[in-house]
């Protein structure tokens, strides 16, 4: 018999294995490889928003006050886009515009590009986080795939649209009232509400809200009664082995209400995923079209008839006049450097005037 003395040589982990072990360790807040992208980018994006809305003026870019320091509140403060003259410059702090001067960089709108780019990568990092965790616990990746909808909307609105226009100036500023103004701009300059992709987006988002309400109410209505009494808050103590609610009862109820009903839970939940995500993707595609100045529906025959016949008017022709008014007012206000002057006689007037 042979006895070997000594230690078994330990395999040395390389740097990748060491990092992988630390990053994917089970802890209260999972980090993961995706966290290397998510956490720094989210930190910088949120920090940029808080810094900009607290201290930074938009006087040099838009001629408005936009910070708490200047008297704005939560709804009116914003991190505003750079001036139109800066076009698509990345506005790096060390670039030729700011030349390392932080105050100058803020005045030029550098915080907006900082927040927009870090925000986009933070959202992508969050989607990768869902992929990574799903793989770790052996789930399918539908959460991550669904989150591509909000990412598509953010990237199309904040990055692709202004890239198709003359500069970052025409993107939305990061603020509540600023976003509302951007929506009015979209309506006036692109007739966005009559765009079929916007219609599909509205149908998707509102349809998803309806499906969510119906589904939640139906599950609550058909909870199985058990020995402890059926109540909503047993959800926080999920010890039962059997089904939580009766799909058969729910199917019978909605069959009587509508004549048709979901009979398969997988199809039902896929449909609840499909409706909002498809709506968001359609909206994003529509905004990419607007970046290229593609037009919405035009009912030219109604416009011609309204111009010829003072007694003929439709809600469409009234909206077209409204859009002209928005353009006339917003162009002069938002682009003072263009010196746009509209004489009274060219401003839109309804047939009644």
Swiss-Prot record:
Keywords: Acetylation, Chlorophyll, Chloroplast, Chromophore, Electron transport, Iron, Magnesium, Membrane, Metal-binding, Oxidoreductase, Phosphoprotein, Photosynthesis, Photosystem II, Plastid, Thylakoid, Transmembrane, Transmembrane helix, Transport. Fe cation binds at residues 215, 269. The lineage of its organism: Eukaryota, Viridiplantae, Streptophyta, Embryophyta, Tracheophyta. The keyword Electron transport applies. Photosystem II (PSII) is a light-driven water:plastoquinone oxidoreductase that uses light energy to abstract electrons from H(2)O, generating O(2) and a proton gradient subsequently used for ATP formation. It consists of a core antenna complex that captures photons, and an electron transfer chain that converts photonic excitation into a charge separation. The D1/D2 (PsbA/PsbD) reaction center heterodimer binds P680, the primary electron donor of PSII as well as several subsequent electron acceptors. D2 is needed for assembly of a stable PSII complex. 2 of the reaction center chlorophylls (ChlD1 and ChlD2) are entirely coordinated by water. Chlorophyll a ChlzD2 binds at residue 118. PSII is composed of 1 copy each of membrane proteins PsbA, PsbB, PsbC, PsbD, PsbE, PsbF, PsbH, PsbI, PsbJ, PsbK, PsbL, PsbM, PsbT, PsbX, PsbY, PsbZ, Psb30/Ycf12, at least 3 peripheral proteins of the oxygen-evolving complex and a large number of cofactors. It forms dimeric complexes. Pheophytin a binds at residues 130, 143. Its main location: plastid. It is found in: Plastid, Chloroplast thylakoid membrane. Disulfide bonds: none annotated. The D1/D2 heterodimer binds P680, chlorophylls that are the primary electron donor of PSII, and subsequent electron acceptors. It shares a non-heme iron and each subunit binds pheophytin, quinone, additional chlorophylls, carotenoids and lipids. There is also a Cl(-1) ion associated with D1 and D2, which is required for oxygen evolution. The PSII complex binds additional chlorophylls, carotenoids and specific lipids. The keyword Iron applies. It comes from the Eukaryota. GO terms for cellular component: chloroplast thylakoid membrane; photosystem II. The chain crosses the membrane at residues 41-61, 125-141, 153-166, 208-228, 279-295. The modification N-acetylthreonine is found at residue 2. Chlorophyll a PD2 binds at residue 198. The gene is psbD. This is Photosystem II D2 protein.
């Amino acid at each position: 018999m042979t006895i070997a003395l000594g230690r078994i040589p330990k395999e040395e982990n390389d740097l990748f294995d060491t990092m992988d072990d630390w990053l994917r360790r089970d802890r209260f807040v999972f980090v993961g490889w995706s966290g290397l992208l998510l956490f720094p980018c989210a930190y910088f994006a949120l920090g940029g928003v808080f810094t900009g809305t607290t201290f930074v003026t938009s006087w040099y870019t838009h001629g408005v006050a936009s910070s708490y320091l200047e008297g704005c509140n939560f709804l009116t403060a914003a991190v505003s886009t750079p001036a139109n003259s800066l076009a698509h410059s990345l506005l790096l702090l060390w670039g030729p515009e700011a030349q390392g001067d932080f105050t100058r960089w803020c005045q030029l709108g550098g915080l907006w590009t900082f927040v927009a780019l870090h925000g986009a990568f933070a959202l992508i990092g969050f989607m990768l986080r869902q992929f990574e965790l799903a793989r770790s616990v052996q789930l399918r990746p539908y959460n991550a795939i669904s989150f591509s909808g909000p990412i598509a909307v953010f990237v199309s609105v904040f990055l692709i649209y202004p890239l198709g226009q003359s500069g970052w100036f025409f993107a939305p500023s990061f603020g509540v009232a600023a976003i509302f103004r951007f929506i009015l701009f979209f309506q006036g300059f692109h007739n966005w509400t009559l765009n079929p992709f916007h219609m599909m987006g509205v149908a998707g988002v509102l349809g998803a809200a309806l499906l969510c309400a119906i589904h939640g109410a139906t599950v609550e209505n058909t909870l199985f009664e058990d020995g402890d009494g059926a109540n909503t808050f047993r959800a926080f103590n999920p010890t039962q082995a059997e089904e939580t609610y009766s799909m058969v009862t729910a199917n019978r109820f909605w069959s009587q209400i509508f004549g048709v009903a979901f009979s398969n839970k997988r199809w039902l939940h896929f449909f609840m995923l499909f409706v909002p995500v498809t709506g968001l993707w359609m909206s994003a595609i529509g905004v990419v079209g607007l970046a290229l100045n593609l037009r919405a529906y035009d009912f030219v025959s109604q416009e011609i008839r309204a111009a010829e016949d003072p007694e003929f008017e439709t809600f469409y022709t009234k909206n077209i006049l409204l859009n002209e008014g928005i353009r006339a007012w917003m162009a002069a206000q938002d682009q003072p450097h263009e010196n746009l002057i509209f004489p009274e006689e060219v401003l839109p007037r309804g047939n009644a005037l």
